[in-house]
């Protein structure tokens, strides 16, 4: 699939403003170039990210954001290599993925992979202070992990609160 580029990418790259990508963005976020495989309103570049980011030159991107997208990708190795290729040496990537223990993660048939605490350490040279070291021979990426946040939210927390409030109201 050839990318459909709905923005003047050459002008954006020539500009001094930071280049910030939003991968898997079904809508436009201010100041970011949104990339998705669906040609929806607000999508700047329509591309199959399973094939990488070939439409971007090396070291051209200041930041990459991705939220609840990478679990839908088959070829994560290639996409991570492409992120490494297009990020500037001072570039940052901010990735949010659901933890494998999320009860809703298994119900979504479009989820193709699972992520745990150590998943992104396979793409990092930093080991982030974990006790368990992960193998570093799978790829040539040398991302440095600056922070990891693991959040567990109970899907029943608010349901129980509503039931409690209803019960209290019915006393």
Which residues does each PLM region occupy?
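Polar/charged alpha-helical tracts
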Residues: 10-15, 168
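S-adenosyl-L-methionine-dependent methyltransferase catalytic module, highlighting the catalytic core
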Residues: 77-78, 84, 88, 92-171
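Generic structural motif recognizing short loop/turn segments at the entrances and edges of beta-strands
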Residues: 1, 16-17, 31, 139-146
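Class I SAM-dependent methyltransferase Rossmann-like catalytic core
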Residues: 1-11
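Conserved SAM-binding loop
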Residues: 8, 16-101
């Amino acid at each position: 699939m050839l990318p459909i580029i709905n923005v003047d990418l050459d002008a954006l790259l020539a500009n001094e403003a930071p280049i910030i990508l939003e991968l898997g963005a079904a809508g436009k976020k201010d100041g970011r170039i949104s990339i998705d495989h669906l040609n929806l309103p607000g999508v700047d570049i329509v591309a199959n990210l399973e094939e990488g980011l070939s439409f971007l030159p090396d070291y051209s991107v200041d930041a990459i954001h991705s939220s609840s997208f990478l679990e839908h990708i088959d070829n994560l190795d290639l996409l991570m290599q492409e992120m490494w290729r297009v990020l500037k040496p001072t570039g940052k990537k901010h990735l949010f993925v659901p933890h494998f223990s999320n009860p809703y993660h298994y119900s979504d048939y479009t989820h193709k992979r699972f992520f745990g605490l150590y998943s992104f350490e396979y793409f990092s040279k930093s080991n982030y202070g974990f006790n368990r070291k992960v193998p570093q021979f799978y790829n040539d990426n040398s991302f440095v992990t600056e922070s990891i946040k693991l959040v567990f939210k109970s899907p029943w927390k608010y349901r129980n609160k509503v039931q409690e409030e209803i019960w209290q109201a019915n006393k």
